[in-house]
Amino acid sequence: MELNNLKPAEGAKHAKRRVGRGIGSGLGKTAGRGHKGQKSRSGGFHKVGFEGGQMPLQRRLPKRGFTSLTKEFVGEVRLGDLEKLPVDDIDLLALKQAGLIGEMMTSAKIIATGELKRKIVVKGLSATKGARAAIEAAGGSFAE
């Protein structure tokens, strides 16, 4: 089997409906466009959202909110994920390289989900009270 030999199954494809080709086809004369009016003419279209001169919906509704340019991207990391990391010194770069947080994240916070049994050193990351207690109970520490 090769890509250039692939064909759709018999009867799976239908011929395109040819309009305006005689009365016997059922789509002759007006070709399914009806009689008169803007939509029957060639080039007879209106832009999307046009409501015949009435104020369109997207302009009747109020604008809401904005996109902050100073938004901080903070990633969340679970204790269980830190357990699986091969390194003992954990900082933002190590989390990004391991794929635990996205490249756009400017900081990260450790949350107390899962278990941590080994000793780690956390550098420059924040943590919840429960996560901080669990890390220190496992013999780990925080280096700010």
From Swiss-Prot:
UniProt GO BP: translation
Biased composition range(s): Gly residues: 21-31
Region ranges (Disordered): 1-62
Single annotated GO MF: rRNA binding
Key words, A-Z: Ribonucleoprotein, Ribosomal protein, RNA-binding, rRNA-binding
Domain of life the protein comes from: Bacteria
GO cellular component: cytosolic large ribosomal subunit
Pfam families given in the database record: Ribosomal_L27A
Family: Belongs to the universal ribosomal protein uL15 family.
The protein's assembly and partners: Part of the 50S ribosomal subunit.
Function field: Binds to the 23S rRNA.
PANTHER family assigned: 50S RIBOSOMAL PROTEIN L15 (PTHR12934), LARGE RIBOSOMAL SUBUNIT PROTEIN UL15M (PTHR12934:SF11)
Name of the molecule in the record: Large ribosomal subunit protein uL15
